[in-house]
Amino acid sequence: QLASDDYGHMRF
């Protein structure tokens, strides 16, 4: 699932 981490990047 896609989720934006604390850095604002997209992680799969």
Curated annotation (Swiss-Prot):
Query: Where does the protein principally reside?
Result: secreted
Q: Which GO terms describe its cellular component?
A: extracellular region
Pyrrolidone carboxylic acid-modified residues are 1
- Asked if the record carries the keyword Aminoacyl-tRNA synthetase, the reply is no
Please give the Gene Ontology molecular function terms for this protein.
hormone activity
Q: Which residues carry this modification: Sulfotyrosine?
A: 7
Q: Which UniProt keywords apply?
A: Amidation, Hormone, Neuropeptide, Pyrrolidone carboxylic acid, Secreted, Sulfation
Residues that the record marks as modified (Phenylalanine amide) are 12
Q: Where in the cell is it found?
A: Secreted
Biological process terms from the Gene Ontology for this record are: neuropeptide signaling pathway
Q: Name one Pfam family in it.
A: Sulfakinin
| Keyword set includes Secreted | yes
Q: What role does it play?
A: Myotropic peptide.
The family line of this record is:
Belongs to the gastrin/cholecystokinin family.
Q: What is this protein called?
A: Sulfakinin
Name the source organism.
Locusta migratoria
